[in-house]
Amino acid sequence: MKKNRLNLNGVVVINKTQGLSSNKVLQKLKYLFNAQKAGHTGTLDPMATGVLPICFGRATKIAQYLLDSDKEYIATIKLGIETDSGDAEGEIIAKNADIPELTVEYLETVLAKFRGDIVQIPPMYSALKHNGQPLYKLAREGKAIEVKPRNINIYELELLEFNTDSLKIRVKCSKGTYIRSLAIDIGKALGCGGHLIALQRTQSGPFRIETALDLDNLKDLSFEQKLASIASVESVFIDKPIYSLVEEEKDDLYKRGLFADKSHLDGTVRIYDDEKFVAIAEFDKGKLISKKFFDQDIFISE
């Protein structure tokens, strides 16, 4: 007989290991927690490691917020070799032994070109779609598609270390940034080509690698300890301003939007009712527009 699955609500932040797909992590976690409903917040390639938030129950409503949030990565780029996928899992398509002499000054000059608002072309080996078909499938079929460039923001780009044919960087970036494309572009800017050989996501939204859980360690926990590892839905918005409703404002917020003269409000706002987190709203031009509602029970519902 199938075990009744639990209606869990919240977020578990996993430190994904190399070789596992994001969907495999999702299925393992769903099994470990015996959860009814679960979803991840954007894939990490199997070769990548690091922060992968998994949403349970009502938290799946806000997965898009995490998908759209800023990210931070540690990336290692191998110079002088290009691959069709832009990473170590692809086929080698070009080699160039003429790697320039790398110095801190030279690398900083090149990296400066990639800081701030830039235009990036996503890699063909990606889940983006063209006429309903994932680009990676078209790439495997040998079909060349013109991929549209997109505007992204590299907030921080720090050189961590380098040697004669590789460099390690820390990248803090906006949604939609492909680190493989960044590796390719940096290789081109250095005149020798390059590809990504290691990638660790160290932050996704408010969640950092320091507090992420290893799957193997999670397996050894008691079920009560597993439940205690679930972060509340509210934790996704912990850095957002708060607005506390009074009774006469509820109807306006729920139905039409609420005008609120509050200078501290901006963008996404946490809504409280009787000291309980009940919704998120967007504040724009003096008006709160509700976006998502949540029940009071954040963890387990009967």
UniProtKB/Swiss-Prot annotation:
The keyword Isomerase applies. GO terms for biological process: mRNA pseudouridine synthesis; tRNA pseudouridine synthesis. It holds the Pfam family TruB_C_2. Keywords: Isomerase, tRNA processing. CDD domains: PseudoU_synth_EcTruB. Its EC number is 5.4.99.25. The keyword tRNA processing applies. The active site is at D45. InterPro entries: PsdUridine_synth_cat_dom_sf (IPR020103), PsdUridine_synth_N (IPR002501), tRNA_psdUridine_synth_TruB (IPR014780), TruB_C (IPR032819). It catalyses: uridine(55) in tRNA = pseudouridine(55) in tRNA. GO terms for molecular function: RNA binding; tRNA pseudouridine(55) synthase activity. PANTHER family: PSEUDOURIDYLATE SYNTHASE TRUB1, TRNA-PSEUDOURIDINE SYNTHASE. Responsible for synthesis of pseudouridine from uracil-55 in the psi GC loop of transfer RNAs. NCBIfam families: TruB. Belongs to the pseudouridine synthase TruB family. Type 1 subfamily. This is tRNA pseudouridine synthase B. It comes from Francisella philomiragia subsp. philomiragia (strain ATCC 25017 / CCUG 19701 / FSC 153 / O#319-036).
